[in-house]
Curated annotation (Swiss-Prot):
Pfam families: ThiG. It comes from the Bacteria. One of its GO terms (cellular component) is cytoplasm. This is Thiazole synthase. It comes from Bacillus anthracis. InterPro entries: Aldolase_TIM, Thiazole_synthase_ThiG, ThiG. The lineage of its organism: Bacteria, Bacillati, Bacillota, Bacilli, Bacillales. GO terms for biological process: thiamine diphosphate biosynthetic process. The gene is thiG.
Length: 256
């Protein structure tokens, strides 16, 4: 089970809802992924305008836990305003904090992410901050009392996979809250690797919505995350420089 604050989920795949070709493909991809947590940008949908197409009208909101994010925020105050807007609309008070500090790389602003997380915790939100793979920043966020850490594998939407597995492993080793790898996942192999490192979950969007067949990719991601978790729990063999025979040599007779 993936436990985030008071919530428990069977699936360790969290799925973003943006950039799908249409609602039908989106819904089918969500279904086959078996994701229980869906994330979306509050600023990308007018949740108070009944005339606008609305994801919330298409989904069975009782079936999923919706995770609004603060994408578009440039500082802590903007992030808090977006979070309060989501809560006022009747959504869950679980929020993904996303405060971008650089428009080219879309990397998070560490100072504003810390500030926003602290402010939202004081407001009673369940806080999941998107952060870089900075080990010290992850620890400071954890010390604030956030409910999960969401380090990026690589820049958002890049599909580069995990570019710094060492830092990611350090974050996982020191964590006392769930670590959900977020951003940069490009393939099922990337997702499996994140889970093999010991991550508690993976959040992805573009890898599915941008695939040639989003529905098949959603299923592939589901299976790879399950396989990666099983592999982590099973425990991989140690890496060694020299070969070790897999068949015993003792007792074998030599035919001359």
């Amino acid at each position: 089970m993936l436990n985030i604050g008071p919530f428990s989920f069977h699936s360790r795949l969290l799925l973003g809802t943006g950039k799908f070709p249409d609602f039908d493909v989106q819904q089918k991809a969500i279904d086959v992924s078996e994701a229980e947590v869906l994330t979306f940008a509050v600023r990308r949908m007018d949740i108070f305008d009944a005339k606008q197409p609305n994801l919330l009208e298409k989904l069975d909101v009782k079936k999923y836990k919706l995770l609004p994010n603060t994408a578009g925020a440039k500082n802590a105050e903007e992030a808090v305003r977006i979070a309060k807007l989501a809560k006022a609309s009747g959504l869950c008070d679980m929020i993904k904090v996303e405060v971008i500090g650089d428009d080219r790389t879309l990397l998070p602003d560490p100072v504003e992410t810390l500030r926003a997380s602290e402010m939202l915790l004081e407001e009673g939100f369940i806080v999941l901050p998107y952060t870089s793979d900075d080990v010290v920043l992850a620890r400071k966020l954890q010390e604030l009392g956030v409910h999960a850490i969401m380090p990026g594998a690589s820049p958002i939407g890049s599909g580069l996979g995990i570019v710094n597995p060492l830092n990611l492993s350090f974050i996982i080793e020191q964590a006392t809250v769930p670590v959900i790898v977020d951003a940069g996942i490009g393939s099922p192999a990337d997702a499996a690797f994140a889970m093999e490192l010991g991550a508690d979950g993976v959040l992805l969007n573009t890898a599915v919505s941008g695939a040639k067949d989003p529905i098949k990719m959603a299923q592939a991601m589901k299976l790879s995350i399950e396989a990666g978790r099983l592999g982590f729990e099973a425990g991989r063999i140690a890496r060694k420089r020299c070969a070790t025979a897999s068949s015993p040599l003792e007792g074998m007779s030599v035919v001359e």
